[in-house]
Amino acid sequence: MILFPAIDLKDGQCVRLKLGDMDQAIIYNEDPAAQAKAFEDQGFEWLHVVDLNGAFAGESVNGTAVEAILKATKNPVQLGGGIRTLAHIENWLSRGLRRVILGTVAVRDPALVMEACKAFPGQVAVGIDAKGGKVAVEGWAEASRLGVIELAKKFEGAGVAAIIYTDIDRDGVLAGINWDSTLALAEAVSIPVIASGGLASMEDIRRLATPEMRKLEGAISGRALYDGRIDPAEALSVLRAAA
């Protein structure tokens, strides 16, 4: 079970949004690279990064900050937000990124995801962001008619490295993970699932360490880490003991 600390980038700064609303951004660190190094020093083994501006623009906007993060940490980094073409994917992987996360393009052009998986095996993840059980796109600004499991099943056997599943209604508000929908997704597909949105406390961490959660590859934590609701050393100890 991997605990992924999150760095969400807006205007070059490390922020957290409430319910995916760009107008409700809380700045946690003006130096994302320093934050990445701090997470590494705390013992985390991966880093989850999202270019929030890029998710709305459809192309990389916080590229300078991402490059600084890649230079600051030795940990593998996965990046989402504005990655829409094979050229975007190749560009970031060539710069040292371990894994790209494809969200909007997975809905708009599933064939591109499958092509990317063939071209870059093990380095392509799909981000499924849901609101009211339906997949949202374009930086969560638009709702589609697709159901979460319906979309996920399109990529069975394609070589997708992981599905990052975010419940938008719980993101950034410390409401707790949507356990039911997350586990339902993990049970419906063979692709590893990473839970995102709502992780709020050490109680959530202890639940992640239970046998029923072994279907998950990991979980992403943002605000709970920044606000001190989750102690990094204790959380990592609990999850490693359950491995």
From Swiss-Prot:
Annotated TM spans: none
Write out the entry's keywords from A to Z: Amino-acid biosynthesis, Cytoplasm, Histidine biosynthesis, Isomerase
Record's protein name: 1-(5-phosphoribosyl)-5-[(5-phosphoribosylamino)methylideneamino] imidazole-4-carboxamide isomerase
Q: Give compartment(s).
A: Cytoplasm
Annotated catalytic residues? 8, 129
Source species of the chain: Brucella suis biovar 1 (strain 1330)
Disulfide bonds, paired cysteine numbers: none
The enzyme's E.C. designation: 5.3.1.16
- Alphabetical list of HAMAP family matching this protein: HisA (MF_01014)
List the NCBIfam families: 1-(5-phosphoribosyl)-5-[(5-phosphoribosylamino)methylideneamino]imidazole-4-carboxamide isomerase
Gene3D superfamilies given in the database record: Aldolase class I
| Keyword RNA-binding assigned | no
Write down the SUPFAM superfamilies for this protein, in alphabetical order. Ribulose-phoshate binding barrel
The opening ranks of the lineage are:
Bacteria, Pseudomonadati, Pseudomonadota, Alphaproteobacteria, Hyphomicrobiales
